[in-house]
């Protein structure tokens, strides 16, 4: 330290910091009179040196509002008119007028209404109803949403509360918001194309939360299952005839009018985009707003970005202007079950391919699918620059403008590229990527650490000719490796799995296989394997192969399902035993116990006395075994009896829920149900198995019909079932998991007979969390 010390920076607002320096260095310390802006002043000096005599291209924060009409050139106005034309096409034919002699259908301007409003308007007006669409999201919408919303959903879903409340205040007779279960993408080849878990549930959940029925309003929420064709959608819409009191033939005619309106709108927007692309010059730079339909035109969800870009003289189009639906990317993304994801990545390919196009990619805070898609989007864009901004309710206008200015400035230095004479925007590169369903022999196969299940799963794979090993248990260092590759609010299992693979690769670069199962949708966890593959490819880990069987179809695809189920049951039976008895029980078994050994152990455990409170634990498999920060083991050590939802039962439920994929195995599934029932009877008071597993479907169907994602139907039903015979229920899920939020929105707390406590896991369990849990258990 020298003799003259000057403290700078906003930290000097803290007098304790200043006093600490002065106590150490005395009068040598002075506080700069401009300490709070010294960094900005230094950055300005550096910028001045870099610019030299050149003129700045910065147009100022207030420029869009300053003499806007006078300063716009004809070209800018033309671009603005072009962009706004899509919104005009969406609302074509809508008046918003209310005839007091007619009943009124209110429509929240949210989610898929941004695609289906032409159909909605044509359908209901043809039937003689008034149609009232809520205004575009405003500060008042946000205020109402913040006042009435339950839980931390993604921002687009949270805004629905505000839109519905506005319709309640307008005293409409009906509120129309469809439930999107599946939505077919034209070129998709996946088994099912799911809407996200919120699209599958939001309409009913929010209507119930706002209690619209008590206010004399009826919810119209037909379930759209586009995977089953237009007939399925027609059937869903025609099903409204009974509620509306209108004969089906009249509804059918109105539906035809609505369907034609949607097709006209889609074709008109794509025609617009094709015409614009045909007029581009080599030095033109067109910005493509990449997000879902509702994120494009909603003035809050798009954060005013289209206007900011247009005001700066750029042409702006949206994903809908590009022929994204014409691309088949199935060979590269064979299990991308989100239709929006397919469209977004198709758009990314088109943008990366066209030299004049640049992406502005908007993601949503709290959106599970976006946490995975953003990795794949980055891979598609390669070296081409793009701007990605996460949308949430706390965004800063100044921050958005600053990022836009920096991005546009970088584009100024991109050289102009003339299109080849034979250029075809749809001729993009496809890089086939097929993840193996079964392991290769003679190559080490690493299994995720899953507590008591891992040794028996390893024995199962060894019987099938594999060379199995267990991945390391989660540590802070391993999690840091995984999180170094994350960019958003990825669920905890993703960085944990990725980090464990990267940790293993640091020690050994020889060929290896890693087991990361997939699902058919619709939670983010089904995409872990494909995104981890993308990360490994970027890191040139070509010797690391993934084995990613589809969980829903294991009964049809797996070798020796009987042995696989015994491996799962072995872990379930060990967890049913008191913790201090588990080692002795497993020591009596073969590497993979047979049926007689399992039943003998179950009877021995059933003969033991139970002690302590009975606490149910229901959640995702990794959270119940490896990612709970030792909470369940600690409770057992304190004398509590923890009844963990059996993994065998959870997968059996998933397989039965997807019986169309497993019909040849229906008889085997019935046999396994009988085995679980027998084992449950033998375990007695130690059993976490349902006495009659079929009752789980009755509970699930009443609360979450037409739902796919995170095995949420089982988790809901199991929590309710266990609550009738336990003192408390703990639900364990990764923080930010959308399915966990859905279960809460569907009233799981109220449905359970015992008190319920949610463990939202992100590897940060601490004394404060323990205090909350202990306070909860004290009253159970």
Label for each model-derived stretch:
Residues 1, 15, 23, 27-28, ...:
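An N-terminal assembly and electron-transfer interface module characteristic of large anaerobic redox
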Residues 2-13:
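Glycine-rich beta-strand-to-loop/alpha-helix junction loops that act as flexible
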Residues 18:
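FAD-binding beta-loop-beta segment adjacent to the flavin cofactor pocket
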């Amino acid at each position: 330290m020298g003799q003259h010390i000057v403290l700078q920076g906003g930290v000097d607002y803290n007098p304790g910091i200043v006093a600490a320096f002065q106590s150490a260095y005395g009068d040598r310390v002075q506080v700069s009179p401009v300490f709070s802006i010294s960094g900005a002043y230094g950055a300005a000096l550096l910028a001045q040196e870099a610019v030299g005599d050149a003129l700045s291209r910065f147009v100022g924060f207030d420029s869009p509002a300053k003499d806007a009409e006078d300063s716009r050139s004809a070209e800018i106005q033309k671009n603005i008119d072009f962009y706004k034309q899509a919104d005009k096409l969406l609302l074509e034919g809508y008046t918003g007028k209310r005839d007091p002699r007619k009943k009124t259908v209110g429509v929240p301007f949210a989610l898929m209404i941004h695609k289906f409003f032409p159909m909605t308007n044509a359908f209901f007006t043809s039937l003689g109803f008034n149609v009232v669409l809520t205004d575009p999201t405003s500060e008042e919408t946000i205020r109402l949403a913040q006042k009435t919303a339950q839980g931390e959903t993604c921002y687009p879903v949270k805004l629905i509360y505000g839109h519905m409340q506005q319709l309640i205040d307008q005293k409409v007779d009906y509120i129309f918001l469809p439930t999107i279960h599946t939505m077919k993408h034209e070129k998709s080849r996946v088994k099912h194309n799911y809407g996200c878990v919120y699209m599958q549930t939001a309409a009913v959940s929010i209507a119930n939360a706002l209690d619209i029925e008590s206010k004399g309003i009826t919810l119209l929420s037909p379930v759209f299952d586009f995977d089953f064709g237009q007939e399925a959608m027609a059937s869903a819409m025609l099903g409204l005839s009974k509620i509306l009191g209108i004969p089906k033939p009249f509804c059918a005619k109105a539906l035809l009018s609505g369907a034609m309106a949607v097709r006209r709108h889609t074709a008109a927007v794509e025609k617009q985009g094709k015409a614009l692309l045909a007029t581009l010059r080599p030095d033109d730079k067109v910005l493509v707003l990449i997000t879902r339909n509702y994120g494009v035109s909603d003035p809050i969800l798009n954060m005013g970005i289209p206007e900011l870009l247009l005001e700066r003289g750029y042409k702006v189009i949206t994903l809908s202007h590009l022929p994204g639906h014409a691309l088949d990317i199935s060979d590269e993304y064979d299990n991308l079950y989100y239709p929006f994801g397919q469209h977004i990545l198709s758009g990314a390919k088109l943008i990366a391919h066209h030299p004049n196009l640049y992406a502005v990619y908007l993601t949503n805070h709290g959106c599970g699918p976006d946490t995975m898609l953003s990795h794949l989007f980055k891979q598609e864009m390669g070296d081409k620059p793009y701007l990605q901004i996460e949308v949430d309710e706390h965004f800063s206008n100044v921050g958005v403008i600053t990022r836009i200015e920096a991005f546009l400035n970088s584009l100024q230095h991109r050289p102009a590229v003339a299109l080849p004479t034979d250029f075809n925007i749809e001729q993009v590169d496809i890089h086939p990527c097929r993840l193996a369903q079964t392991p290769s022999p003679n190559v080490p196969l690493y299994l995720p650490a899953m507590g008591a299940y891992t040794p028996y799963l390893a024995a199962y794979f060894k019987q099938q000719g594999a060379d199995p090993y267990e991945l390391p248990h989660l540590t802070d260092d391993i999690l840091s490796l995984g999180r170094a590759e994350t960019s958003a609010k990825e669920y905890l299992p993703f960085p944990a799995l990725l980090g464990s693979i990267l940790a293993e690769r640091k020690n050994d670069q020889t060929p290896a296989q890693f087991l990361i199962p997939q699902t058919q949708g619709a939670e983010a966890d089904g995409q872990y394997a494909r995104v981890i593959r993308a990360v490994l490819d970027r890191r040139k880990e070509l010797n690391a192969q993934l084995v990613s069987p589809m969980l829903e179809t294991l009964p049809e695809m797996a070798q020796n399902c009987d042995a696989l189920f015994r491996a799962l049951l072995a872990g379930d039976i060990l967890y049913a035993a008191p913790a201090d008895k588990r080692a002795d029980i497993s020591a009596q078994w073969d590497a993979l116990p047979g049926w007689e050994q399992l039943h003998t152990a179950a009877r021995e455990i059933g003969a033991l006395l139970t002690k302590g409170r009975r606490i149910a634990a229901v959640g995702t498999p990794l959270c119940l075994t490896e990612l709970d920060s030792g909470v369940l083991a600690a409770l057992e050590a304190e004398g509590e009896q923890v009844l963990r939802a059996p993994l065998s039962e959870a997968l059996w439920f998933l397989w039965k829920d997807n019986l169309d994929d497993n019909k040849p195995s229906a008889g085997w599934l019935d046999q396994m149900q009988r085995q679980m029932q027998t084992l449950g009877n033998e375990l007695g008071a130690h059993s976490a198995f349902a006495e009659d597993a079929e009752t789980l479907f009755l509970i699930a169907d009443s609360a979450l019909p037409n739902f796919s994602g995170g095995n949420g139907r089982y988790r809901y039903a199991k929590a309710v079932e266990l609550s009738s015979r336990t003192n408390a229920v703990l639900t364990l899920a990764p923080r930010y998991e959308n399915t966990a939020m859905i279960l809460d929105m569907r009233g799981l707390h109220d449905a359970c007979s015992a008190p319920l406590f949610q463990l939202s896991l992100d590897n940060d369990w601490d004394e404060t969390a323990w205090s909350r849990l202990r306070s909860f258990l004290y009253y159970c």
